[in-house]
Amino acid sequence: MKRRLYLSSSSPRRKELLDQAGIPFDLVNAPVEETGLPNESPESFVLRMAVEKALSGFNKVPGKNVWVLGSDTIILKDGKVFGKPKHKMDAYRMLMSFSGEEHTVMTSIAIVNDGAVYSDVCQTNVFFRPISDSEFEQYWATGEAEDKAGAYGIQGQAAKFIEKIEGSYSAVMGLPLYELDKLLRESNFYSE
């Protein structure tokens, strides 16, 4: 029986990365409320979000021989969590706090298969060069900042702000492919 992977996400970047990795998948629409719990650590939050997304998707997919993937990304700097910007000034605040500084991107993944949950969190340090106000304005005008954690996408025009990374490029983009492959192997996705 052919195994199916379902992506419980609306992220075009996650779809692109799965295509890049050559992993066939279907989409399942299973949004979850992304709200932190009292005293929840950033790592616990991002991991819980991936698990909740995968479980929510699993509950919507018929059949037994299915694997459902959930993922979430947050940015952490100086103990503060940065999600998606709510408006232009929020994006400005985020990008200027990264300007000339280092921050951490945390991307979690979870796979649910037949009641079992496999999960991991990938942390990548990202170093920005200084960004001017005019560069921010130009970047904001591209529209790229609006739907991304930390108000930037490493794969887009914000790449020019990134001096270097320590960790996984694909995790910063939204789906750590090495960790995904590891979890797919652990969950016997590739087995005949």
UniProtKB/Swiss-Prot annotation:
Q: Which GO terms describe its molecular function?
A: dTTP diphosphatase activity; UTP diphosphatase activity
Q: Which NCBIfam families match?
A: maf (TIGR00172)
* Cofactors: a divalent metal cation
Top-level EC class: hydrolase
Family membership: Belongs to the Maf family. YhdE subfamily.
Indicate what this protein is called per its UniProt record: dTTP/UTP pyrophosphatase
Q: What is its EC number?
A: 3.6.1.9
Positions marked as site (Important for substrate specificity) = 13, 73, 155
Location of the active site:
72
Transport recorded as keyword: no
Per the record, what are the reactions this protein catalyses? dTTP + H2O = dTMP + diphosphate + H(+); UTP + H2O = UMP + diphosphate + H(+)
Location comes to: Cytoplasm
The free-text function statement in the UniProt record for this protein reads: Nucleoside triphosphate pyrophosphatase that hydrolyzes dTTP and UTP. May have a dual role in cell division arrest and in preventing the incorporation of modified nucleotides into cellular nucleic acids.
Major localization listed first in the record, in broad terms: cytoplasm
UniProt entry tagged with the keyword Hydrolase: yes
> The organism sits in which domain of life?
Bacteria
Entry's Gene Ontology cellular component terms: cytoplasm
Single GO BP term: nucleotide metabolic process
Q: Which UniProt keywords apply?
A: Cytoplasm, Hydrolase, Nucleotide metabolism
Alphabetized InterPro entries for the sequence? ITPase-like_fam, Maf-like
